Amino acid sequence: MELRADLRSILQYLPLVAQSSSLVWPPSVEEELQTISRGPSESMVNSGEALALHITNMRKSLSLNASDLAPYALQGYGLFFDKKISREESANFFGEVVPALCRLLLQLPSMLEKHYQKADHVLDGVKSGLRLLGPQEAGIVLLSQELIAALLACSFFCLFPEVDRSLKNLQGINFSGLFSFPYMRHCTKQENKIKCLIHYFGRICRWMPTGFVSFERKILPLEYHPHFVSYPKADSWANSVTPLCSIEIHTSGAIEDQPCEALEVDFADEYFGGLTLSYDTLQEEIRFVINPELIAGMIFLPRMDANEAIEIVGVERFSGYTGYGPSFQYAGDYTDNKDLDIFRRRKTRVIAIDAMPDPGMGQYKLDALIREVNKAFSGYMHQCKYNIDVKHDPEASSSHVPLTSDSASQVIESSHRWCIDHEEKKIGVATGNWGCGVFGGDPELKIMLQWLAISQSGRPFMSYYTFGLQALQNLNQVIEMVALQEMTVGDLWKKLVEYSSERLSRRTWLGFFSWLMTSLST
């Protein structure tokens, strides 16, 4: 296999080495994997402590530093498998799952070679090979569920090199942070995240799924181009005559349980996956452990810029759960009955968009409003389906990162091949209190910004989950009043800007809903 450009970009972040135009495990690592694959009667890997010893050996063979692991992570493997789960569960994991994972890892080199052989032909010639998909690089990676399982097995055994990942704005991908002893000793949410992932490994070892998952970096270009939608400025939003889409309000339930075909919003960190592989269990982290295939994107997707979003199609859900934050608990097996599309991806579409953290009063500044509405728009909009209602300024400039003409061409190429896939006219957006909670955003402001972005993108509806937030109790009343006024995207945008100006100048302390109803009634 030739050392292709896509493979070259990611090879230093993989545990394999290139040798005589092939990908291989170092001999000593392959020997360890073969030994463990034969089961605990031969390998003696029958406890968390024994597993930690073999992880240490394999990492030494890969020349990986012990100091790169999270503090006391290997002790954490011992604690979890020897103390936190039952003897029966532990015996099954070491007797069945661990050997199967090692057999899967032994196939990783050949799986990757087959992946690259097909990568240029699956999507009508659009490149879809595993590669570093960096900032301002519109593009897609299409992986089989089997290949994802093997990559996540590498994470479980902590085999990924950590060196230089931060230089490319990549998070750590090994599971050592999950097993970090100081966190897990007193943290039930930590052990429940691990239980979700252990359950996933058990499922795929009993029956390997045969579908595919795509990871797409979507870009809203910052420079003007006559043939695609670029980053709108304030005047563009103010001049929009697009009607507002319909809204369905849900005071209970969860985004991932929505019954329609809709984009399901991941309240993302700018680093895709957030704190999934460490201590947090908020919306993004929970989604990543009940749909573990999302974690694979953390291998090759660096930090998002302000004009970028990440869309993932095809991830399977494996676990049920209850609770949120410190009360999060694994709640057993989940059977995902979503249909498959023509690319054998589940019809689950997750869109990752990161809101501004801790914005304070700064969220009412015009630049912040533009940043947030365009961040949402970059995720919800689809270039090849979008009819331009916004009047763009050809001379528009941006204070953000530049986008080259090559990247602009990638945007067009990246979008065109999905015209045969997405039935965009019927696919709405399922979302909730994006950028609120620990992020500190104003929920009344954020829902309106999302409504604008969803409407302008041509989506037919917004399915909004309030999670019982008291601040949104008057939401239905506001929606009815806006509908009676037959407001457009431009009309609502101008009201948001006017309100935000009054908040900044301390001319009002009302929430946006109360302010808007007063404004419209007079």
UniProtKB/Swiss-Prot annotation:
Catalyses which reaction(s): [(1''->2')-ADP-alpha-D-ribose](n) + H2O = [(1''->2')-ADP-alpha-D-ribose](n-1) + ADP-D-ribose
The keyword Transcription regulation is annotated on this UniProt entry: no
InterPro entries named among the record's database cross-references: PARG_cat_C (IPR046372), PARG_helical (IPR048362), Poly_GlycHdrlase (IPR007724)
GO MF, one example: poly(ADP-ribose) glycohydrolase activity
Known EC number: 3.2.1.143
EC category: hydrolase
One GO BP: defense response to fungus
Similarity comment: Belongs to the poly(ADP-ribose) glycohydrolase family.
Function: Poly(ADP-ribose) synthesized after DNA damage is only present transiently and is rapidly degraded by poly(ADP-ribose) glycohydrolase.
Protein name: Probable poly(ADP-ribose) glycohydrolase 2
Organism the protein comes from: Arabidopsis thaliana
